[in-house]
Amino acid sequence: MAEDVRAEIVASVLEVVVHEGDQIGEGDTLVLLESMKMEIPVLAEVAGTVTKVNVAEGDVIQAGHLIAVID
């Protein structure tokens, strides 16, 4: 079953670490966000394959924004 990864805060996307098709493990960093001059990693809560990456470096995203989908 697909797992949506969503932003918990308003932030800028500093770095996209994974790409569609990548195999990832639980706890792997998916993207690095920046908010209030702090770098915040977004970690995978499940292992699987990244089926969608919905952000790019430099994007400003809102809380609840879909970052990626893991299947």
From Swiss-Prot:
<feature type="modified residue" description="N6-biotinyllysine">
    <location>
        <position position="37"/>
    </location>
</feature>
<dbReference type="InterPro" id="IPR050709">
    <property type="entry name" value="Biotin_Carboxyl_Carrier/Decarb"/>
</dbReference>
<feature type="domain" description="Biotinyl-binding">
    <location>
        <begin position="2"/>
        <end position="71"/>
    </location>
</feature>
<protein>
    <recommendedName>
        <fullName>Biotinylated protein TB7.3 homolog</fullName>
    </recommendedName>
</protein>
<dbReference type="Pfam" id="PF00364">
    <property type="entry name" value="Biotin_lipoyl"/>
</dbReference>
<dbReference type="InterPro" id="IPR000089">
    <property type="entry name" value="Biotin_lipoyl"/>
</dbReference>
<keyword id="KW-0092">Biotin</keyword>
<dbReference type="InterPro" id="IPR011053">
    <property type="entry name" value="Single_hybrid_motif"/>
</dbReference>
